[in-house]
Regions:
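Glycine-rich, phosphate-binding/catalytic loops in enzymes
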Residues: 48-54, 200, 232-234
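Autoinhibitory propeptides
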Residues: 1-31, 38-54, 313-316, 321-326, ...
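Surface-exposed loop/edge segments in extracytoplasmic proteins
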Residues: 274-280
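Substrate-binding/access-modulating region of protease and related hydrolase catalytic domains
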Residues: 141-232, 249-263, 269-272, 286, ...
């Protein structure tokens, strides 16, 4: 999972709501749980008018473990500790001696400001009186970044850490007996979009509880040409996908999701015209193919991953893809319409420059 866009609250007209005196809807008595890159707790945006922090807790997954009631890794700082750090900062001392968490990228702080900044100058958040609980996610492990060909300098997180962050926020709000709104400023270019992933199931289960709401972004990849859809025809006919690689890199990942109970298979044509004939759709099979002229390699896996939907997914890893036009021909092996969707890695995570034509 990678970071999503940071856009203005003017698009939802939120400032008009907070300015209505008869509504008095400013987030008071509600916890906003933020799952992101952390938060700059020194910012006055997150303090009340008395100068005390509105941040009730920060769970920094990247720090050394300190025993607590909620989780078994990372460190949790409570509101009293944050106020102590603020007082030290105002007195010219080092606040990080007391609360050692930072937001290096600023993404989490920005989103927290959009949601819950108090009025400073001409700016105000959507819920300026809400309490804040923030989870700073740790970066994805190296073997996962290597497997998905994630760019070295990209900010990328693991699904398991996000799920545990959501569970922590729910447990914390439950202990405090306060309503909870979870905001996750993250997204992934992969997956079926059916709501059957492990993270989707966790978030769905949380929203079944009273006074719990989950907010996520959508549409950030709309114009980046990372999606393709079409109808695969019955063999020997096929639907052709074209992927243009403008800049060679470590690689990228492609997923092709079948619709309904259809079974799909693929063939591959490299930029120099080297052909890998239609690969038999043996569920659970994993095969690799080398392209000598391009010095490239493609791994092809046929999988069924969602027990509820029962959809087939063809998982393809392009390693050192040569620049030029790669063609993927998609075949249907049934008499069903053969509709499918294909997605490649998020643009901001991709080590090379590739997109659908």
């Amino acid at each position: 999972y990678g970071l999503m866009d940071t856009s203005s609250i003017d698009a939802v007209n939120a400032t008009n709501i907070t300015s209505q005196p008869f509504l008095n809807s400013k987030g008071q008595g509600v916890i906003v749980g933020i799952i992101d890159t952390g938060i700059d707790y020194l910012s006055e945006n997150f303090c009340d008018t008395a100068g005390n922090t509105r941040i009730m807790a920060i769970w920094d997954q990247t720090l050394e473990y300190r025993q607590n009631l909620y989780v078994n890794y990372g460190r949790i700082y409570e509101q009293a500790e944050i106020n102590t750090a603020l007082e030290a900062y105002r007195n010219g001392l080092n606040p990080y001696d007391y609360v050692g968490t930072t937001d290096i990228t600023g993404h989490g702080t920005f989103m927290a400001g959009v949601i819950a900044s108090r009025k400073i100058d001409d700016y105000i958040g959507v819920a300026p009186e809400a309490s804040i609980v923030c989870v700073k996610l740790k970066n994805a492990k190296k073997y996962l970044r290597d497997y998905f060909y994630i760019r070295d300098d990209a900010v990328c997180f693991e699904e398991t850490d996000i799920m545990l962050a959501a569970r922590f926020l729910k447990d914390y709000a439950g202990l405090k007996k306060m309503p909870l709104v979870i905001y996750m400023g993250l997204g992934s270019g992969l997956g079926s979009r059916t709501g059957g992933s492990p993270l989707s199931n966790v978030l769905d289960s949380l929203t079944m509880h009273v006074n719990t709401c989950v907010v996520v972004p959508a549409g950030n990849e709309a114009v980046k040409r990372t999606h393709f859809s079409g109808y695969a025809s019955v063999v020997p006919e096929y639907k052709e996908m074209e992927i243009n690689v403008e800049r060679r890199g470590k690689g990228f990942v492609l997923e092709i999701w079948a619709k309904s109970l259809d079974v799909l298979s693929v063939s591959i044509i490299s930029p120099t015209g080297e052909i890998i004939p239609r690969i038999p759709a043996r569920i659970g099979s994993s095969t690799q193919y080398s392209f000598l002229l391009e010095n490239s390699r493609i791994y092809v896996d046929y999988q069924i991953t969602e027990t509820v939907a029962g959809q087939e997914v063809i998982f393809m890893r392009f390693e050192r893809p040569a620049e030029g036009l790669w063609k993927i021909d998609v075949y249907s092996l049934t008499n069903l319409p053969g509709y499918f969707n294909a997605w490649i890695t998020l643009k901001e995570l991709m080590d090379c420059d590739a997109y659908f034509l």
